[in-house]
Amino acid sequence: GLFSVLGSVAKHLLPHVVPVIAEKL
């Protein structure tokens, strides 16, 4: 369903987003 798609997208994006957020902190 839609949530499983969003979950897959989130798993792919998180590794890229987390370092960016960490740098800003």
Curated annotation (Swiss-Prot):
Where do the coiled-coil regions begin and end?
none
Keyword Membrane among record annotations: no
Q: What is its main location?
A: secreted
Q: Which InterPro entries does the protein's record reference? A: Caerin_1 (IPR010000)
**Secreted listed as a keyword:** yes
Q: Name one GO biological process term.
A: defense response to bacterium
Which keywords does this Swiss-Prot/TrEMBL entry list? Amidation, Amphibian defense peptide, Antibiotic, Antimicrobial, Secreted
Tissue spec: Expressed by the skin dorsal glands.
Q: Which family does it belong to?
A: Belongs to the frog skin active peptide (FSAP) family. Caerin subfamily.
Described by its record, this protein's role is as follows: Shows significant activity against Gram-positive organisms, but is less effective against Gram-negative organisms.
- Protein's name in the database: Caerin-1.18
Tell me the organism: Ranoidea gracilenta
Q: What is the lineage of its organism?
A: Eukaryota, Metazoa, Chordata, Craniata, Vertebrata
